[in-house]
Amino acid sequence: MYVDEKRVGDEYLTPYSNDYNEWVQYQTYDVTEEVSKQGMLRVLLGNGWYKARFGFSAFEDKGFYGNEWKLIAELHLTYADGSEEVIGTDESWQVRRSKIAFSNLYDGEHRDDTLSELPLEKAVFCEAPKGELTERMSLPVTIHETFEPKELLHTPAGELVFDMGQEFTGIFKLHVNVPAGTKIHVQTGEILQRGNFYNDNLRSAKSEYIYISDGTEMDLVPHFTFYGYRYVKIEGIPDLKKEDFTGLSYYSNITATGWMKTGSDLVNQLISNVRWGLKCNFVDVPTDCPQRDERMGWTGDAQVFSPTAMYLEDTYAFYAKYLYDMAKEQSVLGGKVPHVVPSCGVEDAACVWGDAACIIPWNLYLFYGDKSILEDQFVSMKSWVEYITKVDGDNHGWRSVFHFGDWLALDNPVQARSRSWVQRTRSLLQTCIMRSAQESWQKRPVC
């Protein structure tokens, strides 16, 4: 959002990632300093999680939740005489295509500054998303660190590749001064192979930025995508210099609370790697990876890592939002906890993964001592245990359905599945956690 040419706030990727069929977050900003009598309010809309391909339907070129750009906004004005006015989105607002021709969380962004500016047209009313408009729970996603390239590599394949010296999640700033019509192609990757740029591990994710210049010298910054990367391949700038590029690391606004330093450089590097693994995967949702065509909130990953995350950072609000979304998903799935949250249409459940509904709230209580999270999530915890009990029935049906095992373990005779004793012990653990949670919250024994 902009007032005249000034960007409002410092957040990226709003309104963030959650089940848009159940709830839609709104954000508020103080624009007192930006607003003038002749000020123009502008909002730039991208595909985001709502309209772009995402999740396990990622090979389909359509959004899971919808295929329209939608905006609901209000400008609240209080005048010097005390009178108030609210200017809301309606058909008096005007729209037109921007210079951003394409955006996608997996595939990147395309910007073409040679596109002619189209005339303004009246906005039209559209059907609202299914979810209830809800005050934000997501922490702001903002830039926390910047990185300068450690080296400009000339690879054996003749490529120009920046080595940032550090893997991180975020975007970049690229200074360009090239003739009109020049095409600049930026690609990101995590490793080199035989000294050359490599990104085949990203599967279908293109993870790129394409720019067509109109000849204006400027700094390019992507708006509606993010990358997980260390290496950056750039084509179209023959006199490329290290000072032209800056890496911008962003993630949710969490605060470091735990530190440890040892006498071993290897152990210290391991601790640093763990913390950076957290930062890279805490972009609004606790994800499995920040770079390939997935980047989803896997519940098993989230619960296993949650104690470590709570030692390192203040993650209470971050996980509270994730759990709220999880409970919303359960409310329409009969208590079932999907493998990923938001589910993006995935309705399967399994032990360990679904156990996040009980384990994460309990860990939040143990680490932060706030019993309200147990009260807030108790229906979610209880419905998960009841779902397991229902599926198990009199014939131990819970043991016969698919459950993830040690992923790609070569000694597991049943592919990626776990053995039945795992389901039995995990079910007992969730029941014990739920019982302890209710006793802690209600301050009395329960039956």
Show where each model-derived region lies.
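Second-shell loop/turn segments in exported
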Residues: T257-G263, P307-M310, R424
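An alpha-helical repeat/solenoid feature that recognizes helix-turn-helix modules
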Residues: W298-V304, Y311, G354, S427-T431
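Structural helix-adjacent loops and short alpha-helical linkers that scaffold large soluble proteins
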Residues: I237-F245, V267, Y311-L323, A327-G334, ...
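Stable alpha-helical elements in mature extracytoplasmic
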Residues: L270, D301, Y322, A357, ...
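The feature captures the catalytic groove of carbohydrate-active enzymes
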Residues: D107, S207, T287-C289, L333-A357, ...
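Extracellular/oxidizing-compartment recognition motifs
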Residues: M1-R292, G300-D301, A317-A320, V337-G345, ...
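Amphipathic, well-packed alpha-helical segments that form the structural scaffold of globular domains
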Residues: R275, K279-V283, Y324-A327, W362, ...
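Acidic, mature catalytic/reactive cores of soluble proteins
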Residues: A180, H185-L192, K261, F378-K390, ...
